[in-house]
Amino acid sequence: MSDVAEEKAEFLVIRTYGSESFRKECADLIEKELHKLNATIARVPVGEFVAYAENAVKNETDSEAVGSSSVKRENSANDSPANTNDVDIVSSPVKRGRGRKAKNPSADADVNDTGSSPVKKGRGRPIKNPSADAGSPLVKKGRGRRAQTPAADTDAIDTASSPVKKGRGRPAKNPSADAGSPLVKKGRGRQAKNLAADTDAIDTASSPVKKGRGRPLKKTAAEADVNGLGSPSANRITGCPPSTKVSNQSSPPEPAVNESEEADEPVLKRGRSVKQPKDESESDDEDAEKAPAAIPKKRGRPGKSAIDAFFDGSD
């Protein structure tokens, strides 16, 4: 041991932090390294050593071999613990096996509360949690993405009563709250067509409505009968004259028929045409040509024969 070494005799104070099992492992490792340097070791509570050695700290590589960046090199003559402004790493988590101190942004930034925010395993970096500032409870699990709240900008949408998609704070479109129409498709914001607002003829309250849409059905035959005469086929059977009022019937009104033309046409009876009887004047002329002139035919009325007329002297 040289004189220079005697003058610069140094001692190390090594402290380890963490769980009890981790500190014991560090203690065994440090003890092995100090034995290689022929250092005198004195163990204080678990995980703390005071090592006196002549050549324990000759250069910085020896301090790195110890395995902790929290090693403090103190000179008994010059240095003092009061001059060291090191960060207290007792409360901050440290990676296992390395002496690298975990980043602790909570000391600089007052916005993030690391006490209540979840921390990733093995690092002291807190997860971003802007929901604490925005006041929105809808935050994705494990991510710091803030939920979109358009209800703050638009007063028409009530996000408290409107359905919300799973996992996002985006409210579903609900124009029915503005339009006041109860006929809205399930799960979509499409507003039902409400024709009753434009046309007064259609009563959507009493008319049947298709399922899922606000489009009313077409009028039935009972609603289309304005005159109260029933169907057009019934008018023909009963013989009622066609009405002069404009109705929704598809058949046009029947034209007027002349009586002279009606006599010549055959009469329809159960789908068959029946010949009309001939006039009496026409039948008498035809019989006169066939029968002899002396004896005319009697057609049910009293008359004289030709012989009686000859004796009487009448023509």
From Swiss-Prot:
Cellular component per GO, a single term: nucleus
Consequence of gene loss (knockout): RNAi-mediated knockdown significantly reduces protein levels of ATP-dependent chaperones cdc-48.1 and cdc-48.2 in embryos.
Biased composition (Low complexity): 147-160, 196-205
Keyword entries, A-Z: DNA-binding, Nucleus, Transcription, Transcription regulation
Residue ranges of DNA binding: 118-128
Record region (Disordered): 57-315
UniProt xrefs under InterPro entries: AT_hook_DNA-bd_motif (IPR017956)
Source species, domain of life: Eukaryota
Localization annotation: Nucleus
Bias kind Polar residues: ranges: 77-86
A GO biological process held by the record: regulation of DNA-templated transcription
GO molecular function, one term: transcription coregulator activity
PANTHER family tied to this protein: HIGH MOBILITY GROUP PROTEIN HMG-12, HIGH MOBILITY GROUP PROTEINS HMG-A AND C
Family that this chain belongs to: Belongs to the HMGA family.
Described purpose of this protein according to its UniProt entry: Transcriptional regulator. Binds to specific sequence motifs in regulatory elements. May recruit transcription factors, or may induce structural changes in chromatin, to thereby modulate embryonic expression of ATP-dependent chaperone cdc-48.1.
Protein name: High mobility group protein hmg-12
Organism: Caenorhabditis elegans
Gene it is expressed from: hmg-12
